[in-house]
Design a protein with these regions (language model features):
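Short, conserved charged micro-motifs
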Residues: 18-20, 83-88
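Core segments of cupin and vicinal oxygen chelate
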Residues: 11-58
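N-terminal beta-strand motif that seeds the catalytic metal site of vicinal oxygen chelate
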Residues: 1-18, 26, 74-76, 132-135
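Active-site/binding-pocket entry motifs
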Residues: 52-53, 61, 97, 104
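A short, acidic/glycine-rich surface segment
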Residues: 32-33, 60-65, 105-112
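Exposed loop/turn and edge beta-strand positions of beta-sandwich/beta-sheet ligand-binding modules
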Residues: 5, 40-42, 72, 115
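Vicinal oxygen chelate
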Residues: 2, 45, 79, 88-135
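Helix-adjacent hinge/juxtasegments
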Residues: 63-82
């Protein structure tokens, strides 16, 4: 038996509405948005393949969360299936500024041996976002 992946991570936000709109513009699916809006769910999540980011909206309290987690504390690397140019266009079309890259990076695939290039940006809470493109 072994740990084989990440099911979800969690991050707090200072402005849930702004975060939902930002990630929707980038093409992500927001899970449980309607339930969160109606008050039947305390959180919503951003779906990424078979994993998700649970978003803790402002005012959310739970006993099982990072005790020092604050909006902007998260660093996430997404995998982009396409070219660097296509990723740059997607970000530009979504109004997202690339703050660094493209540049060569060491990703996780094949224990860091696959060549990759990445681009960096920030979301509305100032979380660091990276898009990894395996070449």
């Amino acid at each position: 038996m072994a740990t084989v992946g990440i099911d979800h991570i969690a991050m707090p936000t200072a402005n849930a509405e702004r975060l939902i709109q930002f990630y929707k513009k980038l093409g992500f699916t927001i899970n449980d948005e309607a339930e969160w809006r109606s008050g039947t769910a305390n959180i919503f999540s951003i779906q990424i393949g078979d994993s998700k980011i649970n978003v803790h909206p402002e005012g959310y309290t739970a006993s099982y969360k990072g005790p020092t987690a604050v909006p902007g504390c998260t660093d996430i690397c997404f995998v982009w299936e396409g070219s660097v140019e296509e990723c740059q266009k997607m970000l530009s079309d979504s109004g997202v500024e690339v703050i660094r890259g493209p540049g060569a990076r060491k990703g996780a695939r094949k224990n860091g041996t696959l060549p990759a290039v990445s681009l960096y940006a920030r979301d509305p809470d100032e979380n660091l976002l990276e898009w990894m493109i395996y070449t």
